Amino acid sequence: MAAEVKTVIKPLGDRVVVKRIEEEPKTKGGIVLPDTAKEKPQKGKVIAVGTGRVLENGQRVPLEVKEGDIVVFAKYGGTEIEIDGEEYVILSERDLLAVLQ
C-alpha cells in the first residue's frame, strides 16, 4: 500500500498562502445562513510565506508576516486554489491589510 504524499505549497517572492478561517454561519439575530448566502471570509491563517520582494538594487526585503499569523486580506485579492481537498488563497503581501493579535 502506497503512503499518501501531502503536497507542500511554497509561494514565490512576496506572496503568502492563507487558509481561510470560517466564521459562524449565523447572523447577530441568530438566523442560520445557508452556504449560498454567506460571503467568503476575509480572515485567515498564514500557511506559508515567500522569500520576500526583490528591490531594483537586488536587495531582498523579507515579508512582514510569518507562518501562523492570523491576517485580514482584501476582499477581491489573491488566487483561490484547492490542494489535497483543502482550499487556500495565494496573496501578494500588498493584499494583506492587517495582522490580528
UniProtKB/Swiss-Prot annotation:
Keywords: Chaperone, Cytoplasm. PROSITE patterns: CHAPERONINS_CPN10. It comes from the Bacteria. Disulfide bonds: none annotated. It is found in: Cytoplasm. GO terms for biological process: chaperone cofactor-dependent protein refolding. One of its GO terms (molecular function) is unfolded protein binding. GO terms for cellular component: cytoplasm. InterPro entries: Chaperonin_GroES (IPR020818), Chaperonin_GroES_sf (IPR037124), Chaprnonin_Cpn10_CS (IPR018369), GroES-like_sf (IPR011032). Heptamer of 7 subunits arranged in a ring. Interacts with the chaperonin GroEL. Belongs to the GroES chaperonin family. NCBIfam families: PRK00364.1-2 (NF001527), PRK00364.1-6 (NF001530), PRK00364.2-2 (NF001531), PRK00364.2-4 (NF001533), PRK00364.2-5 (NF001534). Together with the chaperonin GroEL, plays an essential role in assisting protein folding. The GroEL-GroES system forms a nano-cage that allows encapsulation of the non-native substrate proteins and provides a physical environment optimized to promote and accelerate protein folding. GroES binds to the apical surface of the GroEL ring, thereby capping the opening of the GroEL channel. This is Co-chaperonin GroES. It comes from Thermus thermophilus (strain ATCC 27634 / DSM 579 / HB8). The gene is groES.
